[in-house]
Amino acid sequence: ASYKLADGLNLSGTFGMNTTLNKSTNLTPFGYAVDGKMGYAPQGALSKGKNDRKVYTMDVKGDYAKNFGDISTESVVGFQAFQTITKNMSGGGQQFPGPGLQVLGALGSNSAGSGFSEVIEAGLMMQTRVGYMDWLYATAGIRQDANSAFGADFSTITYPRFNVSFIPTAMTGGAIGPMSTLRLRMAWGQAGQQPGAFDQYTTFLPWASEFGPGLSPGNVGDPSLKPEVSTEIEFGGEVAFL
């Protein structure tokens, strides 16, 4: 949805949901090893799995543009949020009691498992571009992100950016020697990637055996884990010849 609130002032928003449901079944029928030479599950085996993933998105932004003589300005303020919910279930086992019974409850030995995770990521973005007489442009922006993977003790992380674009051929009003168009630019900025839902924490997994229930190591974890931050510097240009 998009709305024009005033001259040069616009508000837009996008909301969506993406859902994916995967189901899998792996069946080895009872008595498949008729020659007696197959060692795996001669009385049959069955495994089933289901993975349900939903991603909810929200993107709202407002932009404002205005000219002051030879100076043009464009400003954007936006907010983004993502919620990812993942649910999975699995079960399987071996030893059917006879032909025709191809359900998990008929297996002589079986196991089951399930999992659930929810990650919420939100970000606030602000950017302003200032231009002078169509030949000099400067853009400055900042983004603040928060992620539920770090728990209640983590607040936000900031990613700034800045770039400049200079067009000498526009400043002179025509070609410079054999060059019909010349554009020079420089950019500096930071970006990052958030970790998974439980990457920071030490986790354990349930474990079942003939000796009884127990736990096995899961994720090793890192209490000092922070968002990944990368810094990029770019110099470039574009040129066209007559």
What is the role of each PLM region?
Residues 1-28, 40-242:
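Extracellular/periplasmic, surface-exposed regions of secreted and cell-surface proteins
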Residues 34-35:
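N-terminal, polar/charged subdomain of small-to-medium soluble alpha/beta proteins
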